[in-house]
Amino acid sequence: MKKTVIAILALAALVSCQSLKEEWQPVLSPAKEPAAFVPYTESSLPGFTGKFTSIEDLKAKYKSKPWEVTGNIWIKGQVTTTDKTGNIYREIYIQDETGGIDLKLGKSSLYSEYALGQTLYVYCDGLTLGAYNGMPQLGWEADQTSTNEYETSYIDLQAIIDQHVFKGPYGDPVEPELISEAELKASIAAGYNGKLWGKLVTVMGAKYGNQIFALFYPNPSLPHKSGNPENRVFLSDNGTWGVNTWSCSKAGYISYLEKGVWDTAEVGSGATRYGRIDTVTPASAGLTGKTLDSFHPYENSTYKEIMIKNASANYISHYFKFGSTDVQVRTSGYAKFADVELDPQLISGAKTADITGIMTIYSGAAQFTLVDEPSVSVKLN
């Protein structure tokens, strides 16, 4: 089926030229609210035989490698996310009574097509079930390009989306599930099979952990793979690095660099370290061949200067403690609230927070994505 669809839509794919990059680059043009339409019902779904697979059972079919779904497999769930704020982009989460899943619809302004609480019916035949650092995802075939290594890719073409995603009736927004630390620990221990991943949840009484995590790629021309330490700068294991905003837009990223609060950050990863970003250059790092050429004409500029030149919005993760368990709240640099400062009382530890969002897993750790502005998703106690 997939090969047939690709052949039919090859010309459309060339025209659309939509990127498969994992980094979020929202098109922040105004979009209309969901328009009136005639919703699908179970009786009107094309080819539906009357039986749904639960989201939990679908995810259980993943066995440590991408699986192209075959057969008349349908799931249904209610929409739990919106891309209005820019923090979730080119994907949508749906949830049934058994769990949630990340549906990789490669479009912007999805909130103009899919409303919170709306039921979506998903025909899974021909789609690919995979994981990104342990997080279940349902999308198109694996993206194994020179710069990316992902088990699924975005469903970019509307014609393909229309064959797989059917809009059902509107409904009330899903109420977040109030979870305990024990439930979160159990999901972490279960890895990919954790019951909380992809679900809309609330954790209560989270304390700020005074630590962040960020990973920057100074040269957009080089791969973003772990095997390219010359193109990696980590901010981790050293407090907050002067970051007091939820993330950083392009302007915020430049501002932090220019203030010098990241000067001691090193280029490299693991055991391979090239030196501080404010002193080392691609040439002095000993880079050679095409790798060095990719920095031309800035091979003798410091990495800090190169990072400012190639600046873009970037993710930041802030650590919180939920009991004794670490939870990262990860925010896109393209979110409308990227440069909003965390409340000083939260940072100081004077107050805790009840946080609502989509719970995910990343490399064995719990990670939160806010689905609304912090003023809505983060309530101080």
Model-flagged regions — what are they?
Residues 1-4, 18:
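Positively charged n-region of N-terminal signal peptides that target proteins for export
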Residues 5-10:
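Sec-dependent signal peptide hydrophobic core
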Residues 13-16:
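C-terminal motif of bacterial Sec signal peptides marking the signal peptidase cleavage site
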Residues 18-89, 93-119, 123-381:
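OB-fold nucleic-acid-binding modules
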